[in-house]
Amino acid sequence: MDPLKLFTGVPKKEYPTAPKTVTPLYPNPMVCRMVLEVNRCENLCVACNSPVLVRDGALCVSQTLDYVKQKLVSDTFMGFTMACLLDCEDLVDSINLAPHVFAQRVFVFRPPNSYLLEMCVLSSMLENCETYTRRFVESLVSRARFIYSKSPCIDACFLLHSIEMMASTIIDYFKLDLEGTQPRYPGLMMYKLHGAIEGGSFESKGLLRPIYHESFKLCSDPDASFDEEEETGEAGVTFNVFYCETIFTKHLRAEAVAKVFKERCLEGFPRHQILS
């Protein structure tokens, strides 16, 4: 019922409305998370984030291309380690998966071409940026869309889907577009809920965070760390993880998560396809 028409006889004027979200490229609610470069040299294996290459507040495409070329000819570069998670499994503070199930979601991906390699670099940048700005996020997404237009394969589609979803999550969580000037990809729901809870009262946070964001399956423990025996693999290979502390890398502090990443990196069997 239109209350304006009921009391005045004048119908309410209809204004055209733009959709707030766009249709996802990849139909399944799964995203590529915790993307880190893997480099190995003799008895040392390192998983680390890609450097955030910014110029004048936006993504520096020329530096990114130079970095991709370096990785293509590198003798130590093995690929990118990553985990595929559903929206409902990424609880921000923890991962709602049993360790043996999570282990099946983690793998090392060796991109077969420069397009997919650059998409992985952009994914790692997006998760490991210390300070997010709308200009940087939008420039990174624009570059990812351009890469996909050059190589529209299913793996590029999935990586672009993940970048779009993570970018929308960042814009929503850090309130970079309060006016909602343009439709965007749907973001991760648990991060939107986390931001709403963090903005509430102390009492509400104490009540709601354990309900929605804590799981005893793979929880993050900032005090947990590997000892020297755990850092060294069976073949005497030392493994280290380096990443930027952001809300998207909190899972890497969990000992069970780091252990799975270590196992996958030391296996030495990267795959050349994300989706088969």
Curated annotation (Swiss-Prot):
Q: What is this protein called?
A: Cytoplasmic envelopment protein 1
Q: What is its main location?
A: virion
Origin species, per record, is Equine herpesvirus 2 (strain 86/87)
- Report if keyword NAD is assigned: no
Entry GO CC: host cell Golgi apparatus; viral tegument
Q: By its UniProt entry, which Pfam families does this protein fall under?
A: Herpes_UL7
**Keywords noted in UniProt:** Host cytoplasm, Host Golgi apparatus, Virion, Virion tegument
* Family under the similarity heading: Belongs to the herpesviridae cytoplasmic envelopment protein 1 family.
Where does this one sit in the cell?
Answer: Virion; Virion tegument; Host cytoplasm; Host Golgi apparatus
Please give the function described in this protein's UniProt entry: Plays a critical role in cytoplasmic virus egress. Participates in the final step of tegumentation and envelope acquisition within the host cytoplasm.
